[in-house]
Amino acid sequence: MTATPWGFRDILPEEAQAREDIALTVRGILKGHGYLPVETPLLEHRDALGGGGRIADTPFKLFDDDGRFLVVRPDNTLPIVRMVASRLDAARLPLRLRYDAPVVRTAPRNTGASRQVTQLGFELIGAGGIE
């Protein structure tokens, strides 16, 4: 089999290089504003991310060896909120966090839409307002 599953595609060198160049520029800007990189797992416990909204719409759901319900992350914000609440709860605020990671989402068939996209973004947590 040589085709990718529908909604997924290979990214060839020219496009991959362009994407990398953009990501390096954005990362540099965010780093200059004090945003620190974080990474979260591709798989998350469904309950830890809440049962509604985008999590309910994720196209890939599975169970681990212990029977726990897992989802492939459809967004990066909720896993970061989970990480902050469980691992960085004593951190000094505001937290400036940045990420660059793939997510998998639902997409209508036969539209050419991608189900896997790379989200490059940031979260400002605990600030009194927009800075």
Positions of the model-derived regions?
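TRNA-recognition modules of translation machinery and tRNA-sensing kinases, especially anticodon-binding
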Residues: 1-131
